[in-house]
Amino acid sequence: MGIFCGLLAALSWGTTDVFIMGLTRRVGTSRALVYTQLGCLLTICLLLLAQHQTPTSNPKLWLLVLGCGVCHVAGMLLMYRAFEIGSLALVSPIGSGFAVVTALLALASGERPAAAALLGALILCCGVVLVTRSHSDQKATMAGVPHAIGSAFAFGAMFWALGFVTPHMGPVWPLLVLRLMALSSAVFTFLIQKRRNTLEPITDKKRIWPLTLGVVATDTIAWIAFNVGVRSDYTTIVTALASLYSAVTVVIAWGLFRERLAPSQWTGVAVIFLGILLVSI
């Protein structure tokens, strides 16, 4: 069950990245965050109403969920910005390095993954180094890379903590907190930029809502799948499988947008995928 859920999350998040890229480049990061987080929050509320599930009263679990929310907001803001200014086929694999952070934290907290998983974590780090090295047009290729790296650390810590939360709270209640915090942060950022008159202009109104609905649907499916997965399997394994979303994103970016990377960077992308696969063994 955990393997299936991890792969489903990977497929869904990989598709989400493409929708996010299209949306942020048409309405900017702030508007995209408000639109998508509001849609996701409404979806989560509908799921909770349908479930009739009573939330836990354990204050420690709620504090841990709040910590997850902080990491989620930080990782999301950094990743949205990376998608807006960077190359999709480059920043997405780097962002998927959150699996390394999760694996290391899980190991430190008592999980004992196989030796292949530890080797995969090391290989993945080497792949990130290769991808972030630019030998040609440095300004074009390195744009968004620092944001993607920061996002990987934030999401890695969040996914590790969710492994302790979802077995007691279920797959949906933690998402409510994450969405509320993400929407609050998005609205705050939007209002500041609006007051400073620094909002990005809307360039294509016709495709805003289809792209927003695409993000809401695929992102919600991915989150539910991940949370169900970590209830039945090691957090390290499910997170590593979910991080394969970057492979889906790169294939779509290569097929639809014809994004190009230097040969050494493609080598780094391949090494990242190898590391992710080893972590999941």
Question: Which functions belong to the PLM regions below?
Answer:
Residues M1-L11, F19-S30, Y35-V65, M76-G86, ...:
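Membrane-interface interhelical linkers
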Residues A9, G67-V73, Y80-V128, L175-L183, ...:
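Specific alpha-helical transmembrane segments that line the substrate/conduction pathway
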Residues A10, G14, V18, C45, ...:
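Hydrophobic/small/kink-forming positions within alpha-helical transmembrane segments
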Residues V34-G39, S92-F98, G150-F153, A217-T218, ...:
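Short hydrophobic alpha-helical membrane-embedded segments
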Residues G39, V101-L105, A114-R133, S264-I281:
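Hydrophobic transmembrane alpha-helices of multi-pass small-molecule transport proteins
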Residues I44-T54, T102-A117, A154-V172, T218-Y234, ...:
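Hydrophobic alpha-helical transmembrane segments in multi-pass integral membrane proteins
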Residues G150-A157, A161-T189, K194-L199:
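Flexible, substrate/cofactor-facing loop regions flanked by secondary structure
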Residues F226-I281:
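C-terminal appended segment following the main domain
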